[in-house]
Amino acid sequence: HLFMNLKIFSPLFLLFLFITFPTFAQKHVPVSQAEIKLSFAPLVKKVAPAVVNIFTRKTVTQRAFSPLFDDPFFRRFFGDSLRNSPQSRKKVQNSLGSGVIVKSDGIIITNHHVIKGAEEITVVLSDRREFDAKVIGSDKRTDLAILKINELKGKLPFLSLRDSDDLEVGDLVLAIGNPFGVGQTVTSGIVSALARTQVGINDLNFFIQTDAAINPGNSGGALVSLDGKLVGINSAIYSKGGGSVGIGFAIPTNMVRTVLTSLASGGRVVRPWIGAEGQGVTSDIAASINMKRPIGVLINRIYPKGPFDRAGIKVGDVIIGVDKHDVNDSESLRFRIITQPIGDSLSIRFIRRGKKQSVTFRIEAPPEKPIINKTELNGFNPLQGVLIGNLSPALADQIGKSLFLHGVIILKIRQGSPAQRFGFQRYDIIKKLNGSEVRGIKQLQSLLSKKPDQWVITINRSGKILSMTVKR
C-alpha cells in the first residue's frame, strides 16, 4: 500500500510546496488536467483593443501587349519598338493587414509590405471606428512602417514594448490580427525558437518563431506575452499553400523599438555599422582554423579606419559574442549591433589564433562620404533618364548593399526613357564606361559628353558583372 499512499500524498505535497514557496510555484509543471485549464479572456480583453485592421488602396498599372507585336511581319519592319511601347491600363487594388497601436496619440506599427505604395490607408479599431491614416516612415529592410491616425480626438489604448531578449523558448504567446479579412482573431501558441535567421523573408533576418497560427492578413499584427506586452510584430509564415502550418515569424520588439525611435519623428533609419563583413563558421571552416566546434562569425573583410579596424579587430578573427549575447552567424551579429543606440559602447568577444579575447568599441553611424550628389542624366546617351548618386557606406546600408562597393549607382529610372529601353535597372552600379573606371558622377558626366561611336558600359547588378554595348 506504500505505492498507493505515495500517489495520494504527492499532489498534496506539491500543493504544499506551491503555497509555501511561491518562487517554486512560478516555474512548476502542471501535474493534473485541472491545473492546465485556463482562459486567456482577461488578457485578450486588455490587449485586443490596441490591435487594428488596416485597409489600403492603390492604383496599379497593368501592361498588355498585343499579339501582333510578336508577329514576324511586324517585327521585320518595327523590331522590338512595338514591344517597348506597351498598352497600359490602370486599376484600383485593395489590400488588408493588421497593425498595433504603440502610443495613445495614434502611432501604429505595421509591416512595410502592408502599406507599400498605398494611396489611401484606413484604420479600423476593435470598436469599429474608422480613421484615415498617413505613413510617418517606412523601412523596407526590416519590413516595418509607422502610421499616424489623422484627426484623432482623445486617446487610444496601446501596447507597451517588452524587451524581446527576455523571451525564452516555450513561453506562451498570443497572436492577434485580421487573417483573411474575417475580422480580429486571437490564436495562442508558444515561442518555438529565438534568433531565427536565414529564412529569406527580408534583408535583415532575425525573428521570433512561433506556432501560434498566423495567416495572410495577420501581417503587422501583435505577438503578445502573457504580461500583456508586445514582444513582436507578426510578419510572415512558412507555408506552401498560403495557410498556417505552425511556423510563423515575428519581428522582435528590440528591432521594432529601434525603427520606431528613428521614424516616429519623421526621420529615416540610421543603422550602426561595424566596418566589417564576415560569415558564419561552418564545420569545414572550424576544422581549417583549429576550432573544436563551429561557432561565431569569421571576419573576412575590414573597412579601413572603420569601427572594427580602430578597435583592433583583424581579418581572421572569429566573433563569438556581443556583450552577454552569443552570435553564430552574420545576421545575429548585425542584429546585436543595429539594435543599440549610436554613441553607446559594446564589448566584442572573439577568438584569435585559438585564444579568447575581448575589446570594447563605440557604436557609430556609417559615413556619408562621398556625398551622394543625386543627379539626373540627360543628353544623347544610353543613360538618359536615370537618377544617379555616389555610393557611400551610408547609402549602401540604406539600400542593403555591401559597404565595400563604390562608384556610381542608379537610384531611379524615368518611365519610357532610353535607359529603361536599354535594360538598365534600379541599383545597377556603373563600374566602367568605354574601358575607363567610373569613380564618381562628375567623371561619368565627362565620359558621356565625349559622344563616341558606341558606348560599352560595365555594371554590377546584384553581384554579377554585365556589359552592355549601345551604338549611336
Question: For each predicted feature, which ranges?
Answer:
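Bacterial N-terminal signal peptides
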Residues: P11-T20
